[in-house]
UniProtKB/Swiss-Prot annotation:
Gene3D superfamilies noted in UniProt: Probable inorganic polyphosphate/atp-NAD kinase, domain 1, Probable inorganic polyphosphate/atp-NAD kinase, domain 2
Gene Ontology MF, one: NAD+ kinase activity
Protein name (record): NAD kinase
Catalytic activity: NAD(+) + ATP = ADP + NADP(+) + H(+)
Cofactor(s) the record lists: a divalent metal cation
Catalytic machinery residues: 72
Encoding gene per record: nadK
Lineage: Bacteria, Pseudomonadati, Pseudomonadota, Gammaproteobacteria, Pseudomonadales
EC number: 2.7.1.23
Purpose of the protein: Involved in the regulation of the intracellular balance of NAD and NADP, and is a key enzyme in the biosynthesis of NADP. Catalyzes specifically the phosphorylation on 2'-hydroxyl of the adenosine moiety of NAD to yield NADP.
Keywords: ATP-binding, Cytoplasm, Kinase, NAD, NADP, Nucleotide-binding, Transferase
Main subcellular localisation: cytoplasm
Keyword ATP-binding among UniProt keywords: yes
HAMAP family found in the cross-reference section: NAD_kinase
Length: 296
């Protein structure tokens, strides 16, 4: 397993719990004589840290492991910035759900030590890249680890659009919007809209209509290498938005085309050896535990 010597730290701003955890993590890493680099925005609120700092974009060039302290939203933002560097990312949960940031603060030293000693799992999670085009010209681009969502923005009106997959017409729909999600994102917004849960190792994309104006509007799972094209109706009287992971937003006009496809670079997500995807689902989604009579 790869040995890590240069460790970057990214954290969610505005939380004293995050800062406390970062201080613990920093001390632990320095005690192991590792080179620690702080993201510059976090460094500004940690006076006297005495460490090298870097912007998030450049962090991937100077580190061989990045640890994210925060919630899943923090890791989503880090993933979009770091995927192009092919650098491993480890998450310490200081948020709510913790689907991606799966190390609890109370087990920080133990689990991080295991990873640094080479005892870890690596998952390659693919991202989506989205582009909004108007009159054959790109007006907005963004990446997403979870999902790309077409929605009406501040309007309460429905959106009319057409869906094409690999150049083939699939259907036209009238709905509150459309969610295009990765397996990683299948347990996020897409799940709330009635989409299926997809195992992270699947090479697939799920397309989930949001409150479609027809009983036949159902989620569809397609090959992960598919290229999706969503054409907004020219007769639409609102300007819908496209959101990537709920963090990057672009405004569309009637007649615009949104293309969504797999991004070439993947996120290398690190887990402790005892990571169990089904246990995560059971814990975070409230699935039932084993029956008391089960012997297995």
């Amino acid at each position: 397993m790869e040995q890590f010597r240069n460790i970057g730290i990214i954290g969610r701003l505005g939380s004293s719990q995050v800062l406390d955890t970062i201080r613990r993590l920093k001390k632990f890493l320095l005690d192991r004589h590792l080179h620690v680099i702080l993201e510059d925005t976090i460094a500004e609120v940690l006076p006297g840290h005495g460490l090298q700092t870097s912007t998030r974009k450049l962090l991937g060039e100077v580190c061989d492991l990045v640890i994210v302290v925060g919630g899943d939203g923090s890791l989503l933002g880090a993933a979009r910035a770091l995927a192009r560097h092919n650098i491993p990312v480890l998450g310490i949960n200081r948020g709510n759900l913790g689907f991606l940031t799966d190390i609890r603060p109370d087990e920080l030293e133990q689990k991080v030590a295991e990873v640094l000693d080479g005892h870890y799992l690596v998952e390659n999670r693919f991202l989506l890249q989205a582009e909004v085009r108007r009159h054959h010209e790109a007006i907005g681009q963004g990446d997403a680890l979870n999902d790309v969502v077409l929605h009406p923005g501040k309007s309460t009106r429905m959106i009319e659009f057409e869906i094409y997959i690999d150049g083939q017409f699939v259907c036209s729909q009238k709905a509150d919007g459309l969610i295009v999600a990765t397996p990683t994102g299948s347990t996020a917004y897409a799940l709330s809209a009635g989409g299926p849960i997809m195992h992270p190792k699947l090479d697939a994309i799920v397309i989930v209509p949001m409150y479609p104006h027809t009983l036949s509007g159902r989620p569809i799972v397609v090959d992960g290498n598919s290229e999706l094209k969503i054409v907004v109706s020219k007769d639409l009287q609102i300007y819908p938005q496209v959101s990537c992971d709920g963090q990057n937003h672009f405004t569309c006009a009637p007649g615009d085309t949104i293309t969504v496809s797999k991004k070439p670079q993947k996120l290398r997500l690190i887990h402790p050896l005892d990571h169990n995807y089904y246990e995560v689902c059971r814990t975070k989604l409230g699935w039932g535990s084993r029956l008391g009579s089960s012997d297995d």
